[in-house]
């Protein structure tokens, strides 16, 4: 028995030495996967926080070495996510790559996919979604309900379509966080339109804006998070706060879920998809847009659901079973936005008071500098009474201010 133990001990020591020498973690007989994320903002940061629970080696590609994700990943590469060679060199030795922003070099991802690197979401779905013109054409081709639209190449084109007003003008590429969107009520607003390729959408009289996060495994299994009801800041065109689950009539709820699944199935890609939907006053539901990644409308799931959207994406990337999307509690999420008139080193006024609030969970994004309208963090409130949670959210909004140090 002693000889057997010594033999087994020697084999175990050799195994440990192998792991150390190769700097690889062996889990269940396989190497730790190397996963890359294109982009290093707050979405990447929260993905990395969730990654700590999994056997994965994380890589970030981002042009800003002081980005929110830089100090949380195993390996950081400073570089342009829109440059073909940079993206290709970053990804060629990785097992799987995902994104935290759509504005990436898809051609490099296509090349990497052809060489065996898993790209989630697929380059083909990303190519469809990243341009709002091709995205709207995708909805039309696949008979997915969406607002009527026209395509414009420049501001001059708008003069030929004044009968289409009131409408929403959306830049084909480059828009984010409320930028790249203009409401054109009549021809006097034409000067606010975009002098670049864009979509002109017929205005829908909106009763509610909702979002449904859809998770798709590599085998095609689908699960949905309950719809979240989004309330936007009219001045910033940014998410102000949201309620989950959304307050919807049952028939609207089922209609919204069916449309979200229909749209994501047509993309034919694994991944996590945030389907933003518009509900009109007659209860009709239209797809506004899809984000093929983790999304602001899913942040509440960190505390509000059994498996967060970030946990869910890692399950998909690493071939684990999909998690439970059931809500733990009703939640209200409030974005923390940089105050108007303040640009510079960020200071959080009222933070101590917010921390005293029961069942309030604060997430700061690690951004050193603030500017008007910049997303600096979010707060999730949990409870059972929606009215009380919304009241708390408004109180916190007035209590907490992100200003620049003097």
Which residues does each predicted region cover?
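Peripheral (often C-terminal) accessory segments that flank ATP-dependent C-N-forming ligase machineries
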Residues: 24, 315-406
